[in-house]
């Protein structure tokens, strides 16, 4: 009987175990998990609702969703796509619904339904909780504090946190240092922070770089959050880690260029010369008042009094409003890192180690990560599937 070890009982590891149990019940599958519960992160992702995947219709390219790991994901999605993921979970008792933002969720909006479906599918696997793997030797003996276990195949699915990687050190694999890749921005601006809860579509960029993102922007009492912020944090993850999470953020509040904004302001001045500038606003009133003050425009100013200098200042604030970045804050619903096992170590079609045939990697332990919106979980499903399929082929050749 061939023996398979899966190290890490997260989404990728449990999905891989479930597939192996369904496809090849004759295999012995052992799942090692250092924590007290399997799929603990999955149970709380998406605010406990579990954003299973995305329909990929809201992105222009795969690199937009996967800043790191696009090549692997292009191959993995051909093997197990987002449609395949929805079909699998539906067939396993988790009907799914698609939201307007392109995100797929369980119809019940309960992540535990996903957890329970995976637990049912992987029934028969030996799941060892509170069992930390200390090392893996070249002959695939998995060492734990309790005992040493020989295996024919090993799948590493420990996630991207640095604490999940030390047991790989003896294999001398190339590891990309992990850094946070989904977080919010800390901006110390009392007047801005007073606008807490305000949301609008905006463009964000990191001044002096090519990193930029567009989407709903949420103003918080500590700075910026929301999809636009999270996308930018993902795209610029390694750059920001290197700079100590310092820099200058630029916000385009209207998602329009200077010429377009200037034209709108001029038309407003022509159409409403005697109205107050504060009374005709392209954004929410509270934000508009804040931006007028930031542009140095006095209260009670009429459109006829705006003048060319006022027009220039207001155009600049609306299209390129800058804020010193003073740090990052954890995004509570996502725990994602950039980094992990370098993709140069593995076969891109099989996710098998080039140095150690029979050793596979899936999920966030690889140097693959994505923006928010279900893309990271899809990476777990797709890479877990590729590993299970690769092992099955190995056992039957």
Where are these regions (language model features)?
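Residue-level recognition of phosphate/Mg2+-coordinating polar/acidic sites
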Residues: 22-23, 37, 58-61, 78, ...
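Glycine-rich FAD pyrophosphate-binding loop
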Residues: 21-47
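Short hydrophobic core segments
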Residues: 5-7, 32, 133, 149-161, ...
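Glycine-rich loop(s) and the adjacent beta-strand/alpha-helix scaffold that form part
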Residues: 153-193
